Amino acid sequence: METIKTIARIRSDFPEKFGIPRQSGVVPETRAEIVFEKPYQNPDALRGVEGFSHLWLIWGFSACERDAWSPTVRPPRLGGNARMGVFATRSPFRPNPIGLSSVTLEEVRLHTPEGPVLVVGGADLMDGTPIYDIKPYLPYADCHPEATGGFAEEKRHYALTVDFPAALEAQIDPAHRAALRGVLAHDPRPSYQSDPERMYGVAFAGKNVKFTVEDGVLTVRKIEEIS
């Protein structure tokens, strides 16, 4: 039993890897839709799911597949310099490139032209990512207040102040502004890049958001349409 079937695809505002939150839940304002593949569009498969506030998503790192794997990786949390064992990290570069995300269940749409759709919050998945399974989050079993977090013990708060000129922010759909600010505040740059003169771009919700970072302040410089 080594065959894993894709039961659904995620529809998110992230068309590429750069800019996606590094963990699920750190930008709770993001919204995504889970659209089921035809063999799994029976609404009965979702009976009772509306009673849960959170879900576990099991999915594939479809944009990070490699022929070979390395026993050690460089976690962004450690600045991209120190190496840790792959099984002590959540790196996408694994023997089996499978991801696990905890998301909030925002809405259940059982009857749409595409079949059942789940709207979720806080997802850290690129648009089109294959979903292999969905399970309910069970607080009594899944929450461990006494847990320790190893090298990722410290909870990270927003690292950057976001300077978003009003004229540029007005080009963003109001429904996406809070999520975009959260994405930018979490510093989407690679940990090894800190050139204040460099212009970066995050593709989000149909826009390419260009920005620079200096002295802890991220300044949005330009908004471009993604064709």
Which residue stretches match the model-derived regions?
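Mixed-charge, low-complexity intrinsically disordered regions
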Residues: M1-I98, L110-S227
